[in-house]
A protein has these predicted regions:
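Conserved catalytic cores of phosphodiester-cleaving nucleases, focusing on short active-site segments
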Residues: 43-49
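Non-catalytic C-terminal interaction segments of nucleic acid-processing enzymes
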Residues: 1-40, 53-149
């Protein structure tokens, strides 16, 4: 659904493995605009389909891989995107398959946010592609205007 959105909007896509996150941004080489080589933005989005995926990532046998992902991304803008507009509410109410205590989960995620400097957003799945595109679009716009890129 994310690639469908980007393709419908004629947004160029480059599939490649990232060291961290599921989505990144690349400004292609365009000498006409003074971009002599492709520029890769140091920013990532990690997509989770629902709260069950997050609680699954925090189980004893999987939490190390999840935390390692956060460690690799702690020095760049990083967002954990949950495709559930009501994900925060579901977390507080314990509406997920895991037996994870809701307040322990809230505490764990907020501790990780503070420790690894990332944010969590909850978005309706039908808007995920739109959110990801505009997230990177406005970062790039800011960085170009500020002369950072």
């Amino acid at each position: 659904h994310i690639l469908d959105y980007l393709q419908q909007k004629d947004i160029p896509i480059k599939n490649q493995k990232l060291d961290t996150g599921d989505y990144g941004c690349m400004i292609p080489k365009n000498e006409e605009f003074g971009i002599p080589r492709a520029i890769y933005l140091d920013s990532r989005v990690e997509r989770k389909a629902h709260m069950d995926e997050i609680t699954g990532n925090l189980q004893k046998d999987t939490q190390t891989a999840f935390e390692n992902e956060l460690i690799r991304s702690k020095d760049i803008p990083f967002t954990l995107l949950v495709e559930d507009l009501h994900g925060y509410e579901k977390m507080l109410q314990g509406k997920y398959r895991s037996k994870y205590n809701p307040f322990a989960l809230l505490g764990r995620l907020n501790t990780f946010k503070a420790k690894y400097n990332f944010e969590i957003v909850y978005v309706d799945k039908k808007f995920t592609g739109n959110w990801i595109y505009h997230h990177f679009y406005y970062q790039v716009k800011h960085y170009l205007r500020a002369g950072i890129l």
